[in-house]
């Protein structure tokens, strides 16, 4: 993957096969998929037959007819070449992926005893077979971890060298065939038979073998076919005007007029634009299951984003220590630091850092203190340390308060529990409520049954994310933050991040309901997820981006898979989708605008002998009627080659509103589509005349 990302359209490994493929695509069945180019190929065959007839019978203007014929075929070949280059980039990626395939042997298990396995060929495995994969083994096929935990190297799929953890029973249980276990062991239930693994699907998709035309492509093809039919009828009426004046127009000239007026530019590049859109996603390590998903991303109205890892860094950091009355900050900091010395969570490490940087308290040796660390559990929701007869705990406010009350009653201090600790409890609850309103998470600290205060943890909003949301807003996209936090915390983080709305205390059912509500309003919705509980919402969303680290159910439900498992990519995916639609629209505008200049080149040339007064339309001052027609047909072919890089790279994306974007593109590609042909045809005319070609 990483190597193929560097492939350029100037790479000989792509260009040379593309030239050969351009000739192979002259197959009528292949050409028939593109109505415009099929018509051009048909008239090219017709003019070739007429040229051969004239060559045999000794017709006039053979040199002119030969050149027109040659450039008509070049037009078809250049269109085929554009598509072949786009496909070639995908084939280069597919070849890179194929190299990661290895003939693997699998340890097929027939019982729960890990030592009892049978070595079989990896491609003989069936769905629901259970295999053992140990350190150094290649995972033989896609599957779900049902037992164990292991470090897995997924560089063959993602291009990232850092290993990832795969374990049973969570949202990191999916494994991909062709990846390697680096440490420990896992028991895997096979979920994909040979030939239908994730790697097989990737190869098939990036090659374009299964690429189907999207609804927008089909609609545009219908429009182009309709315009072609109109120009067929228009061209067919022209001989009658010539006959009325007592003259005639050669068929080769009529064909030249017809081919230059139909939208050959966009017709030639349409397929390449679609392939390149999916290719850009693949280079971004996102796999789209269909071109429809890429287009939908460009039309998205509502973006659902998980708070953790997307809007915030995901690792809550200690930002402040707030003691209750009668307790100093230093005392609270000392206790919080001791309780966190052996806590390897991001929150625990941040408390140690805060105590050192703000209060000058350095880390202490747990062994010298003869301390026993008390780990966090889901049942206690606390962690802490016991040493030298002292006991310190930190954790969720309600859990710590219950711990304090229980300890006071256990030692017979009922009055103390009811009076002294009630005052402290009120103070703790008040501080905790203030922190929650500010978008933070409170952790209460207690030492030997005495409440000391609260550690304020805060989800750090990612730098620049507010500006990104402002860009999306200018594009007319509504952003909704999805979080399990309480409404007060969610509102504070939403305000800081700059999202348009939020869904607090979200459940899978809430997400699904929100998506359906938005779609009922006629809006397209995009979201990302990685868990089995996200699968219904991913399937319902118009753009569902599943994380590669997620469950099999999530990956099957989404219509895109992010190989890097980075939720923030959802924003870039929308931008790539919009770039695809912008490129298609811009080049369609440019192609249609081209006709104006070609009209001024060919119409005067056709009728100059019959209607001399039409000479005023020769605003470009083209040398002769034949040079004008030849220059127009040459420009018509060369502009396809000139625009291949733009069709593959895409029009530059700018986060502005639809109205401003339309105005900008009309100026650049509409006005540019008029001016460029005037200049191009004139320069070609000068060259044709200088070389004596017409």
UniProtKB/Swiss-Prot annotation:
Binding site residues for ATP: 343, 347, 376-383, 394
Residues that coordinate or bind Mg(2+): 530, 534
Keywords from the UniProt entry: ATP-binding, Cell inner membrane, Cell membrane, Ion transport, Magnesium, Membrane, Metal-binding, Nucleotide-binding, Phosphoprotein, Potassium, Potassium transport, Translocase, Transmembrane, Transmembrane helix, Transport
GO cellular component: plasma membrane
Keyword NADP: no
Cellular location(s): Cell inner membrane
Superkingdom to which the source organism belongs: Bacteria
GO molecular function: ATP binding; ATP hydrolysis activity; magnesium ion binding; P-type potassium transmembrane transporter activity
Principal location: membrane
Membrane topology, as annotated: Multi-pass membrane protein
InterPro entries tied to this protein: ATPase_P-typ_cyto_dom_N (IPR023299), ATPase_P-typ_P_site (IPR018303), ATPase_P-typ_TM_dom_sf (IPR023298), ATPase_P-typ_transduc_dom_A_sf (IPR008250), HAD-like_sf (IPR036412), HAD_sf (IPR023214), P-type_ATPase_bsu_IA (IPR006391), P_typ_ATPase (IPR001757)
Pfam families attached to this UniProt entry: E1-E2_ATPase (PF00122), Hydrolase (PF00702)
EC number: 7.2.2.6
TM ranges: 36-56, 62-82, 218-238, 249-269, 600-620, 628-648, 666-686
Active-site residues annotated for this sequence: 306
Catalytic activity: K(+)(out) + ATP + H2O = K(+)(in) + ADP + phosphate + H(+)
Subunit structure, interactors included: The system is composed of three essential subunits: KdpA, KdpB and KdpC.
PANTHER family listed in its UniProt record: POTASSIUM-TRANSPORTING ATPASE ATP-BINDING SUBUNIT
Known function: Part of the high-affinity ATP-driven potassium transport (or Kdp) system, which catalyzes the hydrolysis of ATP coupled with the electrogenic transport of potassium into the cytoplasm. This subunit is responsible for energy coupling to the transport system and for the release of the potassium ions to the cytoplasm.
Protein family (similarity comment): Belongs to the cation transport ATPase (P-type) (TC 3.A.3) family. Type IA subfamily.
Protein name stated in the entry: Potassium-transporting ATPase ATP-binding subunit
Protein's organism: Agrobacterium fabrum (strain C58 / ATCC 33970) (Agrobacterium tumefaciens (strain C58))
Lineage: Bacteria, Pseudomonadati, Pseudomonadota, Alphaproteobacteria, Hyphomicrobiales
